[in-house]
Design a protein with these regions (language model features):
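Positively charged n-region of N-terminal signal peptides that target proteins for export
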Residues: 1-7
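Bacterial Sec-type N-terminal signal peptides, specifically the leucine/valine-rich hydrophobic h-region
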Residues: 15-18
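Acidic, serine/threonine-rich low-complexity disordered tracts
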Residues: 24-85, 94, 103-222
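Surface-exposed loop/edge segments in extracytoplasmic proteins
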Residues: 56-57, 87, 208-210, 262-272
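Surface-exposed, glycine/proline- and aromatic-rich loop segments on solvent-exposed faces
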Residues: 73-78, 86-89, 93-94, 255, ...
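Acidic, Ser/Thr/Pro-rich low-complexity intrinsically disordered segments
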Residues: 218-276
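Cysteine-clustered segments with highest specificity for TGF-beta superfamily mature ligands
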Residues: 284-285
């Protein structure tokens, strides 16, 4: 009988808290160019996030710092701790974390990626890497302070996004893969300044990911991975795991055990015949 298990694990440094603080249509005509905005601590944008693997989630992106990278970058955090943890494991939202002040460039694998090349001008073209995909981007049109952009990849994937100068960030951002599935959709619901409340950004490291699949009646898989301290902040605060599991019928079962170096069980899960689970996100202190 078929038994399959896939799991991704990540050990995480911290949740940084700050207290007190549909399709896209092209547009043409309008201003010659749109300049990069200046953000302040507490500026916020309320988005609805949609992906094929999860239910829609609405959360605020909030400017938590304006002094990252020697005062050259902002830090964007989020009001949902679950979304912050998911991003740490899956790189779910590229606009969480550091963004440059010069171009609002998002960081991927430690490198700033110019998703928007300010000043934004009609027919301007540039390239960047996002979601580990290389994109060729261009400005489709400008109308007042609203700029519609698109980007294409060699595999047929495409991005469509709109920058709204009146709010200082995206009003929409959609990533569609080569098969036509929208892998990520961000739609702006509201925006403002002076956010009050906790926001989070979780820094992840020591990422471990693997997939096990077997159609035989019995299989045992053992694997080992090592977790080191963060290079500047010492021990991690927690481990976050993300898993999918699917068990065949008949007498099939799946048993998952995660042990530490002292053989203490940190996580134990069992699935019986026909059981399945998808997109589970959990934490281990």
């Amino acid at each position: 009988m078929r038994a399959a298990l896939s799991m991704a694990l990540s050990a995480l440094l911290m949740a940084t808290a700050l207290s007190g603080c549909s399709g896209i249509s092209g547009i043409v005509g309008g201003s010659d160019s749109v300049e990069v905005p200046t953000w302040e601590i507490g500026d916020w944008w309320l988005y609805t996030f949609s992906t094929p693997d999860y239910t829609d989630d609405t959360a605020r992106l909030v400017v938590a710092s304006v002094s990252e990278e020697d005062n050259t970058s902002y830090l964007l955090a989020i009001s949902s701790l679950t979304e912050a943890r998911r991003h740490a494991v899956l790189n779910h939202n590229p606009f969480l974390g550091r963004m440059t002040q010069e171009d609002l460039s998002a960081y991927e694998n430690g490198e700033a990626q110019t998703v928007m090349d300010f000043p934004l001008e009609e027919d301007k073209t540039w390239g960047f890497t996002l979601f580990s995909i290389e994109w060729s981007a261009s400005v489709w049109g400008i109308s007042g302070n609203s700029v519609t952009m698109g980007a294409n990849a060699d595999d047929g994937s495409h991005l469509e996004y709109v920058y709204d100068g009146d709010v200082g960030f995206f009003s929409a951002f959609v990533w569609t893969d080569a098969s036509g599935v929208q892998q990520m959709r961000m739609m702006l619901a509201d925006s403002g300044g002076g956010h009050s409340g906790d926001v989070y950004f979780v820094r992840g490291g020591d990422l471990y990911s693997d997939v096990w699949e077997d159609t035989g009646p019995d299989i045992e898989v053992r694997d080992t991975f090592f977790v080191s301290d963060h290079p500047s902040d010492g021990e991690w605060d927690e481990m976050i795991y993300f898993l999918d599991a699917e068990c065949g019928g008949g007498s099939s079962t799946i048993s998952l055990t995660l042990r530490d170096h002292g053989s203490l069980s940190a996580l134990e899960r069992v699935w019986g015949p026909g059981a399945s689970e998808s997109g589970t996100l959990g934490t281990i202190p």
